[in-house]
Amino acid sequence: MLMPVHFLLLLLLLLGGPRTGLPHKFYKAKPIFSCLNTALSEAEKGQWEDASLLSKRSFHYLRSRDASSGEEEEGKEKKTFPISGARGGARGTRYRYVSQAQPRGKPRQDTAKSPHRTKFTLSLDVPTNIMNLLFNIAKAKNLRAQAAANAHLMAQIGRKK
């Protein structure tokens, strides 16, 4: 039962891995993709038998594979807004996905057309934490240096006696 999953992972690793000097030839990959589809279907059949293991580990991907739940989740994540093209009319209308987190009144700007750059701000906690870590490292180095100096002095005292 677990063999198709390992087989699927091996095929995905071989297909998705970087290749040196060889272009991806997808026109010859039909048998490989059919093997992937059969392995995936066998894995989905086997996952129903192992439902107790899946509920313990909280793998939600395989349990929500029916089409209706996938469409509902996709509908919650993204919305489409029509964008009129340069030609106008129905021929020039394109659709762009806008995530739910963006404001509803303003569709987002294209990043290529945006004149100003995105600014990132850090909270003051991040530099404070970094400085605390650097101070702790410096203290530890100082303590190690003092311990080494003390050990050296103790060795000299021991030689003199």
Swiss-Prot record:
The entry's keywords: Amidation, Hormone, Secreted, Signal
One Gene Ontology term from the biological process aspect of the record: response to immobilization stress
GO cellular component: axon terminus; extracellular region; extracellular space; varicosity
Keyword hit for Phosphoprotein: no
Propeptide: 22-118
Compartment(s) of residence: Secreted
Alphabetical list of InterPro entries matching this protein: CRF, Urocortin_II/III
Keyword Methyltransferase on entry: no
Region span, Disordered: 64-118
Pfam families assigned to the protein according to its UniProt record, in alphabetical order: CRF
GO MF term (any one): corticotropin-releasing hormone receptor 2 binding
Principal location class: secreted
Signal peptide coordinates: 1-21
Residues modified as Isoleucine amide: 157
Family: Belongs to the sauvagine/corticotropin-releasing factor/urotensin I family.
Subunit text: Binds with high affinity to CRF receptors 2-alpha and 2-beta.
Record's function text: Suppresses food intake, delays gastric emptying and decreases heat-induced edema. Might represent an endogenous ligand for maintaining homeostasis after stress.
Protein name from the UniProt record: Urocortin-3
Organism: Homo sapiens
